[in-house]
Amino acid sequence: MSEQFKDNFWGPNGFETIEKRMNQGTESTRLFLLFLKERAAIEENYSKSLQKLLKSTSQLIEYGTLRDAWYGVRGEAESLVRVHHELGQKIEKDIVAPFSKFKSEQKKVKKNFLYDAYKLNKERKDMESSITKTRAKYDDYSKQAETIAITMETAKNTKTAAEVGKIQSKLQKIQRDASSAEQDYRDSVNKLSMYQPTWEDKVSSNYHTLQLTEEERIDYIKVQLEKYVGAIKSTVPDTETTNRNLVNVITQIDKLEDIHCFVRESRTGTEKPPPPQFISFGGKSSSDYIQNKASYSAPLTSSVSSNSLTSSYNSATTTPTPAPRSTPINLSKKKQAKALYDYVGSDATELDFFAGDIITILDEDESGWFRGELGDRIGLYPSNYCEPI
């Protein structure tokens, strides 16, 4: 299994995990540099302190063997002054100065790469957020259309034509809003679907670049630690065993092993996010309620006379429940009906007409929904909106 950044951080918080490691690396570099700077300062200060001590005791006068011993003590201290001064200077000039420059330069480079990764991460999150919002809007309008369609179905049994017309107008508006919201939702899904391959390539490239900067950091610190051991070895006597152990552990620093260790312990997922899918409204579509108008119950049964129909609407009384639907009756002789009220169909299967229009009756149904012809249009219409002529 690959243990590269670009193959293991596709899961949730993948970018955040890499970002955290990059920031940890920056902080570690700062602390490595701080240690070396302080070690150099301590060595220099120790050298100066010894020098000051030697100066303050320079008036000590002895004779014979005690004088010889004193000279030996001073000589050892003077040797340490030189050793610690040289070690401090080597660490400061050969390690700290270039290390400080590397730290500043890599911090800027990583900041730019991390910002690129942040933008890519935010870009996708913004697109996903747009999909979530447009889907919620689409579902909301679709649900409203579904509810109003049910209301209109019931209203055709209980309400006046004018009241039904208002409900119908509201339904048509909500359906238009739902259609617009659906298109926005589809556009959001398509936008991310089309961009996804490009986005994946950019993310892979960016993560690989971030890994290279981490490898560079590990390699550079390894070199500086080797120089540090070399400085100690060349200036401090009697440290051969310590130096040998330190050299061995520093030599074993392996950038790839360290990268793989981080990946194994922190990976968020190897599967790239699937492309988004358009999900249709989960409820029953409003079109399910208006697709087959012959199955609707008309406000009044076809057996009610035109006078009763007119009286019923004028008094706004509750209408009786229609009889169950029966098999349509084919007319041997075409009949006509005159529209008593304006009617706007809820879709293309219904006839629109105005009061006074003459409709040729093609089929009658006991449910109250007739099929008729008006001009060059044929469709379903509620028979209780008309009177036979």
Swiss-Prot record:
Coiled-coil region list: 119-192
UniProt cross-references to InterPro entries, sorted A to Z: AH/BAR_dom_sf, F_BAR, FCH_dom, SH3-like_dom_sf, SH3_domain
Disulfide feature: none
Signal sequence bounds: none
Record field: compositional bias (Low complexity): 300-328
Chain segments carrying region Disordered: 300-329
Keywords linked to the UniProt accession: Coiled coil, SH3 domain
Claim: Coiled coil is one of the keywords in the record: yes
Pfam families membership: FCH, SH3_9
PROSITE patterns membership: F_BAR, SH3
GO biological process: actin filament polymerization; chemotaxis to cAMP; vesicle organization
Domain F-BAR stretches: 3-258
Protein name: SH3 and F-BAR domain-containing protein DDB_G0274695
Organism annotation: Dictyostelium discoideum (Social amoeba)
